[in-house]
Amino acid sequence: MAKRDYYEVLGVNKNASDAEIKKAYRRMAQKFHPDRNPGDEESAERFKEVKEAYEVLSDAQKRAAYDQFGHAGVDPSAGGGPRGYGGGAGPGGPDFSDIFSDVFGDIFGSGGGRGGGRSRAFRGADLRYTLELSLEDAVRGTEEQIQVPTHVECDACKGSGSRAGSKPQTCPTCKGHGDVRVQQGFFSIQQTCPRCGGEGTMVTDPCPKCRGRGRVEDRKTLNVRIPAGVDTGDRIRLSGEGEPGERGGPPGDLYVQVAVREHEFFERDGADLHCQVPVDIVTAALGGEVEVPTLDGRVNLRIPPGTQPNQVFRLRGKGVKPVRGNRQGDLLCRIHVETPVNLTKRQRELLEEFQATLQDTGGKHHPHTSSWLDKVKRFIEEWRI
């Protein structure tokens, strides 16, 4: 995925001072720092992006190279042309012929620079949208309509940034060339004009609607197809649905992040579903059937005699078929044996009679209790010794 513009990452314009860049970096770094967002992978990536942008823009030489050649000027492996158009470089990396012509141009009298403001194209920023889904929709798949905050071209100024009836003025610093020459020792280096950002022109009478930005905030409506089997954390990429590019650049992408809401009955674990099934004490002891919910409707679960609390029964094929993989998951039902409450006098008498019959049989009806009591007895005897 193409890198975002470093100025955009820090939220500053291309004419920002060193102090403004440093202040923006501190604000963004604090916002996305991993210590403040534990376990948030998206914030961790944004923090790395902010740190990388600051390392370049806080260094005068790196910033000059970046302003002139884009990402290729500070990272040859980034690919793409030095002008930011995505072309102009051979397979071996960026073409540095412009660098040498700029450096030696004044020394050997080649004169005049490239002339004329240049309009560097910028790819639009990627957008992220969190979409909440019910478990049923996540499992079966669905189509959702979403409204995404974005920026669109200002209809008042047609993207120029200037008030109707006015035009951008020639930059007084570079005289419309878009470049300025900086003397470094014996060399004269040509670099992007810091005042106009290489455009050669400046908006002096800004459009009141967009305040000279050429773009305004808006919301766009999209229909998103959700494949069956998605889970929390899955991302769906919509190519070209991000922020529009600047100066003819391509648009960014939209990443829809799935977040599945908690369910009344089920908890998901990969392809399997888990649920708690309450069973009364008589059914647990004597056996029977209970009705349990599944995503396909209700089914009867057979409870064998002597079922214990937290015993798990598996209903095969009643889970989820994930996006990646062909195995249909299972539904695991954990038994919760309920102790009766609010007993009548007669019910208490019956339970007391029942308890008396259990004591007469030597505890064989409660193997876990008998085993536990034996262990306690041995522990006390050993402790006394």
Swiss-Prot record:
Region (Disordered): 232-251
Domain J: 5-70
Binding of Zn(2+) 1, residues: C154, C157, C207, C210
Cofactor: Zn(2+)
UniProt GO cellular component terms: cytoplasm
Superkingdom of the source species: Bacteria
Coiled-coil region: none
CXXCXGXG motif repeat ranges, renumbered to this chain: 154-161, 171-178, 193-200, 207-214
Domain notes per entry: The J domain is necessary and sufficient to stimulate DnaK ATPase activity. Zinc center 1 plays an important role in the autonomous, DnaK-independent chaperone activity of DnaJ. Zinc center 2 is essential for interaction with DnaK and for DnaJ activity.
Entry protein name: Chaperone protein DnaJ
Organism whose genome encodes this protein: Halorhodospira halophila (strain DSM 244 / SL1)
Phylogenetic classification of the source organism: Bacteria, Pseudomonadati, Pseudomonadota, Gammaproteobacteria, Chromatiales
Gene: dnaJ
